[in-house]
Amino acid sequence: YLTGSLKSKPDLSFETSPSPKLKNILESGLPTESSPFIKKLLKKFPPSELYGKSVKDKRGGKNNIHSWDIELKGAVTEEEKQLLNILLKERRKKKWASEIGIDWMDGMPLTKAQISTFYKHPDLQNILDSLTDKGYLVLEHPKQKIGGQRIKDESLPKGYNIVSGKKSFEINKILDPNDVAPTLVAMDMEHLFVVDNGGLRTLTGKEGLRLFGYPDDYSFDIPKKDRCDLLGNTVAVPVIKAVSERLLHTL
């Protein structure tokens, strides 16, 4: 937050206090959501193992679930999973940008020859074809940075890249009730889920308000999408109150 005062500098040093856990503001026993995606997710992982997990194909990490982990786009063999997990990291290495002849970007398509340097398999082409047919990989030209945009360079050979992007899946993250809530932004609010009743659901309006320090009797009866947009752009009431009280002392 930016603050200002005309004559004296306000004291904005605050004592730290124990962070409240997400479970302190969650409701329970509410209806959960059902979709092919959620069914596949719960088939592979019990709810208790989903706490704090993100669902993305752009990065790795122990707290990340990939689409191939739940076979979202079709069944995959152990060899196909292994290739996807290795390619996920390799395609971000800066050496490939130099070899391809492009500026580095977070995820570059690699040719079969390049892939074969770190994943040696006699049936590599069939594995690549299978993953491309299922939609886990895409065969595309590398991109050049032109005028601040990434434009496909058709003069360069096509390579295999993992299909990914922002908001690729209906769930971005399953919040951990035993941890603090992450930063909430308008773009992601609809894609944050919690475990409840043995299933998964999005945050309720009351829970969203509680996260920002609003009282339970605050009126907020608006459509879900509008609610998520507003909450994702709001401020934490207790923080504003504390800062405002300090500023008042300078008047």
Labelled PLM ranges:
Residues 63-251:
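C-terminal target-recognition/interaction regions appended to catalytic cores
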Residues 1-74, 78-88:
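Flexible, glycine-/basic-rich loop-and-beta segments that form/coincide
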